[in-house]
């Protein structure tokens, strides 16, 4: 009897996994016609797509768990008649791969350490063995990307710089590996910071917006770089604060300010309003949840639907 129950449960889980789409609906960012305002709206939509629907910490939203389905959110970066589709893990905001159109067909590009399902996530139904046109020859870390694209501190973040790098690789032959890999790595370094890092950090979002239309964009300063390295640790420090309201928080030891000086403390209000936009998934010492927001939503929905049965 016990075995039959386990078999039924296993079958139910298998059916659920088959019915659950691997990725949520695409979020579109029109780079060609972007403004600082549409960029900010895009980041808000991305945060909504990856956040835990029930939990917050000190009023801040957090990413969902790594086991929550769907696994990915797809982001379409549009420019002219072309579109790059990025596959981003909802649980940690890692970029696992992307696709463009090459020779009239969807072409996937995946890192050496990409998730095994990234290929079919960006190019549904493509089970082909990865070749020169598909393999990104390094891991998805900054170290990997910088090995081909150079230091990210020298690459500006903004509309013009992003569009420029998109145009250099979209639909281009990847067999000219030296030049293609340099252009691709620069695109990835810019896209990752403008999409995933800016989703995590209001500080980076606001810096990019301030230089959004500048030819050279915003060159990441030491504060931004140190935040990029410490998303987990800053989130955990916030989670350990046991009192609600404003307070002074001791920050992780290797954070830097804009002038590359040690940045040791911040107020909770500063972290909430100016630095963080999305925490990693944490266990918060102060109990909080999305319950009031959820109940408010259902109340408004039920009230608005009362007239439908008249």
Curated annotation (Swiss-Prot):
GO terms for biological process: defense response to virus; negative regulation of translation. Residues 1-25 form the signal peptide. It catalyses: Endohydrolysis of the N-glycosidic bond at one specific adenosine on the 28S rRNA. Keywords: Antiviral defense, Disulfide bond, Hydrolase, Plant defense, Protein synthesis inhibitor, Signal, Toxin. Disulfide bonds join 57-284, 106-123. PAP-II is expressed in early summer leaves (at protein level). PAP-III is expressed in late summer leaves (at protein level). It comes from the Eukaryota. Coiled coil: none annotated. One of its GO terms (molecular function) is rRNA N-glycosylase activity. Its EC number is 3.2.2.22. The active site is at 94, 142, 197, 200. Pfam families: RIP (PF00161). Belongs to the ribosome-inactivating protein family. Type 1 RIP subfamily. 2 forms exist, PAP-II and PAP-III, that differ in their seasonal expression and chromatographic profiles. Both depurinate genomic RNA of immunodeficiency virus type-I (HIV-I) and bacteriophage (MS 2) RNA. PAP-II and PAP-III inhibit the replication of HIV-1 in human peripheral blood mononuclear cells with IC(50) values of 26 nM and 17 nM, respectively. Possesses antiviral potency. Inhibits viral infection of plants (tobacco mosaic virus). Inhibits protein synthesis in both prokaryotes and eukaryotes. This is Antiviral protein II/III. It comes from Phytolacca americana.
């Amino acid at each position: 009897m016990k075995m039959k129950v386990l078999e039924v449960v296993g079958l139910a889980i298998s059916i659920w996994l088959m019915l659950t789409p691997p990725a949520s609906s695409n979020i579109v960012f029109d780079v060609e016609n972007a403004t600082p305002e549409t960029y900010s709206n895009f980041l808000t939509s991305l945060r909504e797509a990856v956040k835990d629907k029930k939990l917050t910490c000190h009023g801040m939203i957090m990413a969902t768990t790594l086991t929550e389905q769907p696994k990915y959110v797809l982001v379409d970066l549009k420019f002219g008649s072309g579109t790059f589709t990025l596959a981003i893990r909802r649980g940690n905001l890692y970029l696992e791969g992307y696709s463009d159109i090459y020779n009239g067909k969807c072409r996937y590009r995946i890192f050496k350490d990409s998730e095994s399902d990234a290929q079919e996530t960006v190019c549904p139904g493509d089970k082909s063995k990865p070749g020169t046109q598909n393999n990104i020859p390094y891991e998805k870390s900054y170290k990997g990307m910088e090995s081909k694209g150079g230091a990210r501190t020298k690459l500006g973040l903004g509309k013009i710089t992003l569009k420029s790098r998109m145009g250099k690789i979209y639909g281009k032959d990847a067999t000219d590996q030296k030049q293609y890999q340099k252009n691709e790595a620069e695109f990835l370094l810019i896209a990752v910071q403008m999409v995933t890092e800016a989703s995590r950090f209001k500080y980076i979002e606001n810096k990019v917006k301030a230089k959004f239309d500048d030819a050279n964009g915003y060159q990441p300063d030491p504060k931004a770089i140190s935040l990029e390295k410490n998303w987990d640790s800053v989130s955990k420090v916030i989670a350990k604060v046991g009192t609600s309201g404003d307070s002074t928080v001791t920050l992780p030891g290797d954070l830097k300010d804009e002038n590359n000086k040690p940045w040791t403390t911040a107020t909770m209000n500063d972290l909430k309003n100016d630095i963080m936009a999305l925490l990693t998934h944490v266990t918060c010492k102060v109990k909080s949840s999305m319950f009031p927001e959820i109940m408010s939503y259902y109340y408004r929905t039920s009230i608005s639907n009362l007239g439908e049965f008249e």
